[in-house]
């Protein structure tokens, strides 16, 4: 199973002071050396990663570059110009802290955007909610890749296996009793397994991402149809204490151990 290292949160730290430190390109070099892919989200408002970040990373890094972006003409044209290995199309709201859900597959521009990117020899992935309907639509749209949104799984795991429900970060919608949460958690995990199998059956390559960390990744790794995980915030958070190289290698070890032991 491959690890795409999302380095957005390195850019978050840089933009907090609007300086050149930490250097996103240096982070990309470390991610390229110890991970399998660099993932970067260039948002419409450029609140974190900037155009020059993407340009420099594509120019100087040999690893595959996975650009996450919305259906925004300016950024899509940037992708067509710079030609990352892959573009993952994601939904985007200006007020959100992080991507809140899967892409709406009924968007009028979606099919045309996919065709333009593929005609430029750029692989296209769709970041979708884990539903059979969205997987079938992704196949109809002729995407090569799908990335299953694991946010709900991650939130349920947090509610069950951490103290988050007793903190300011508790989610009101997950304020149920443990038994109910456990049932929902098992159902969501089964749904991810079913969706990954369906995607593979349809000839789609299947990735997963959002909210994955060192504690909840193990069960996802057991889903053999998933070939890639894109993980960012938890790796960058761990790197504050261990360094980026060690944080990436620790996640790689978790993925390797789970895959080889099952």
From Swiss-Prot:
Alphabetized UniProt keyword annotations: Cytoplasm, Pyridoxine biosynthesis, Transferase
Binding residue positions for 3-amino-2-oxopropyl phosphate: 6, 17, 211, 232-233
CDD domains registered for this protein in UniProt: PNPsynthase (cd00003)
EC top class, as a word: transferase
Residues binding 1-deoxy-D-xylulose 5-phosphate: 8-9, 43, 48, 98
Entry GO terms, CC: cytosol
Active site: 41, 68, 210
SUPFAM superfamilies for the chain: Pyridoxine 5'-phosphate synthase
GO molecular function, one term: pyridoxine 5'-phosphate synthase activity
GO biological process annotation, one example: pyridoxine biosynthetic process
Pathway in which this enzyme or protein is active: Cofactor biosynthesis; pyridoxine 5'-phosphate biosynthesis; pyridoxine 5'-phosphate from D-erythrose 4-phosphate: step 5/5
Site (Transition state stabilizer): 147
Principal place of residence: cytoplasm
Catalysed reaction equations from the record: 3-amino-2-oxopropyl phosphate + 1-deoxy-D-xylulose 5-phosphate = pyridoxine 5'-phosphate + phosphate + 2 H2O + H(+)
InterPro entries reported in the protein's UniProt record: Aldolase_TIM, PyrdxlP_synth_PdxJ, Pyridoxine-5'_phos_synth
Subcellular location: Cytoplasm
EC number of this enzyme: 2.6.99.2
PANTHER family given in the database record: PYRIDOXINE 5'-PHOSPHATE SYNTHASE (PTHR30456:SF0)
Similarity remark: Belongs to the PNP synthase family.
Function: Catalyzes the complicated ring closure reaction between the two acyclic compounds 1-deoxy-D-xylulose-5-phosphate (DXP) and 3-amino-2-oxopropyl phosphate (1-amino-acetone-3-phosphate or AAP) to form pyridoxine 5'-phosphate (PNP) and inorganic phosphate.
UniProt subunit comment: Homooctamer; tetramer of dimers.
Protein name: Pyridoxine 5'-phosphate synthase
Species for this entry: Campylobacter jejuni subsp. jejuni serotype O:23/36 (strain 81-176)
Gene name of the record: pdxJ
């Amino acid at each position: 199973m491959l690890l795409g290292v999302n380095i957005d949160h390195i850019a978050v730290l840089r933009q907090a002071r609007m300086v050149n430190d930490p250097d996103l390109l240096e982070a990309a070099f470390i991610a390229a050396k110890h991970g399998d892919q660099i993932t970067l989200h260039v948002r419409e408002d450029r609140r974190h990663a900037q155009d020059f970040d993407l340009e420099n990373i594509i120019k100087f890094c040999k690893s595959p570059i996975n650009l996450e972006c919305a259906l925004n003409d300016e950024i899509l044209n940037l992708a067509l110009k710079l030609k990352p290995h892959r573009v993952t199309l994601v939904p985007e709201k200006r007020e959100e802290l992080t991507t809140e859900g899967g892409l709406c597959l009924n968007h009028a521009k979606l099919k045309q955007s996919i065709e333009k990117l593929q005609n430029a020899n750029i692989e296209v992935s769709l970041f979708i909610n884990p539903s059979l309907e969205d997987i079938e639509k992704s196949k109809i749209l002729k995407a090569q890749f799908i990335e299953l949104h694991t946010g709900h799984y991650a939130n349920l795991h947090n509610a069950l296996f951490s103290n988050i429900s007793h903190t300011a970060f508790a989610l009101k919608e997950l304020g149920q009793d443990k038994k109910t949460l456990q049932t929902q958690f098992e159902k969501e995990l089964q749904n991810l397994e079913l969706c990954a199998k369906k995607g593979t059956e349809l000839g789609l390559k299947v990735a997963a991402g959002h909210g994955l960390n060192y504690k909840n990744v193990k069960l996802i790794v057991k889903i053999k149809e998933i070939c890639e995980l894109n993980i960012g915030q938890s790796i960058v958070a761990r790197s504050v204490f261990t360094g980026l190289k060690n944080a990436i290698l620790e996640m790689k070890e978790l993925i390797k151990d789970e895959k080889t032991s099952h």
